[in-house]
Amino acid sequence: MSSTEKLPTIASPQEIGSLAPLPTFTYAPPQRSDLAQLVALRVYVDGLSAQEPKTAAVIASSFVFNSSILDNTLRSAGIPQPEGPKTAVTTFATVDKRDGFSWAALECDYLIVADPIQYHLGEENQHLVTVLAQPVLEGTGIGTAYRRLDVSFPLQDGVTVYVYERTRDIAPEEYQAISAELTALYPEYAAQYHSPV
């Protein structure tokens, strides 16, 4: 240090009159533009159990719509969970090589399906979603067991969510068709896709 440079002055504790308060700021995460539609969907789904308990499965897996988004909508919007009936939402597995097919979804009273079909890892890694969502949306194959209710929920990014009511039991051959389709894609994971009937 040269003789012309000054050392910084440090105040003693007695010289500090008072500490400045910590700066105040608030941070609110961005709010979804479709939050009202998500709330309406959650309320509608729970209303399906008004007369008797019902079950549903969400057949979608993207950052726009998935089962966690449906489950947490009211809480994230700061809306208290209302008293009264609540439709039980069954877990639906969505990752091909990690998860087995969620056969319990085929026993649910309702399927909640997004159009276009929603993925977070790409269609090539989420055939579990496609194998059920596509025929339900198209009304073909196993999709003939479901009737689309007269309600839709438009979400962000051009996604629309529909609710389908199961109108009949799923036939053993429909279970087996799902098993065969998934096993053909991943023969080494056949045990994960084995039909229970």
Task: Show where each model-derived region lies.
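Transmembrane alpha-helical segments
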Residues: M1-S33
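C-terminal luminal/periplasmic domains and tails of membrane-associated envelope-modifying transferases
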Residues: A20-V58, F63, S67-V197
